[in-house]
Amino acid sequence: MGNFRFPIKTKLPPGFINARILRDNFKRQQFKENEILVKSLKFIARNMNLPTKLRLEAQLKLNALPNYMRSTQIKNRCVDSGHARFVLSDFRLCRYQFRENALKGNLPGVKKGIW
């Protein structure tokens, strides 16, 4: 399923959705689809044993790729709220959602600290 905002059709993520989550999801999908192409072009561009012309062409192709195909564009976001700050990567939750879910007992192996 696609929408008007993105140049390529994308699937919608499950759960909470806002514009930032849609953008991040689109970038993740495009990075996943083009990862092999980008890695091969980087290998060619950085291989000193190859001819200079071939390396230069690979570098120009890399520079021509859109920004949304780069891994640096991907941001860790909370799957419950969409927050991008203080996301615990093991649970993919922001600190507030982590606290709420831990207190409810929704996270296995996590309990309130007592000392």
Swiss-Prot record:
<dbReference type="InterPro" id="IPR001209">
    <property type="entry name" value="Ribosomal_uS14"/>
</dbReference>
<keyword id="KW-0687">Ribonucleoprotein</keyword>
<dbReference type="InterPro" id="IPR018271">
    <property type="entry name" value="Ribosomal_uS14_CS"/>
</dbReference>
<dbReference type="GO" id="GO:0032543">
    <property type="term" value="P:mitochondrial translation"/>
</dbReference>
<dbReference type="GO" id="GO:0005743">
    <property type="term" value="C:mitochondrial inner membrane"/>
</dbReference>
<comment type="subunit">
    <text>Component of the mitochondrial small ribosomal subunit (mt-SSU). Mature yeast 74S mitochondrial ribosomes consist of a small (37S) and a large (54S) subunit. The 37S small subunit contains a 15S ribosomal RNA (15S mt-rRNA) and 34 different proteins. The 54S large subunit contains a 21S rRNA (21S mt-rRNA) and 46 different proteins.</text>
</comment>
<dbReference type="GO" id="GO:0005739">
    <property type="term" value="C:mitochondrion"/>
</dbReference>
<keyword id="KW-0496">Mitochondrion</keyword>
<dbReference type="Pfam" id="PF00253">
    <property type="entry name" value="Ribosomal_S14"/>
</dbReference>
<dbReference type="GO" id="GO:0003735">
    <property type="term" value="F:structural constituent of ribosome"/>
</dbReference>
<comment type="function">
    <text>Component of the mitochondrial ribosome (mitoribosome), a dedicated translation machinery responsible for the synthesis of mitochondrial genome-encoded proteins, including at least some of the essential transmembrane subunits of the mitochondrial respiratory chain. The mitoribosomes are attached to the mitochondrial inner membrane and translation products are cotranslationally integrated into the membrane.</text>
</comment>
<keyword id="KW-0689">Ribosomal protein</keyword>
<protein>
    <recommendedName>
        <fullName>Small ribosomal subunit protein uS14m</fullName>
    </recommendedName>
</protein>
<dbReference type="GO" id="GO:0005763">
    <property type="term" value="C:mitochondrial small ribosomal subunit"/>
</dbReference>
<comment type="similarity">
    <text>Belongs to the universal ribosomal protein uS14 family.</text>
</comment>
<dbReference type="GO" id="GO:0006412">
    <property type="term" value="P:translation"/>
</dbReference>
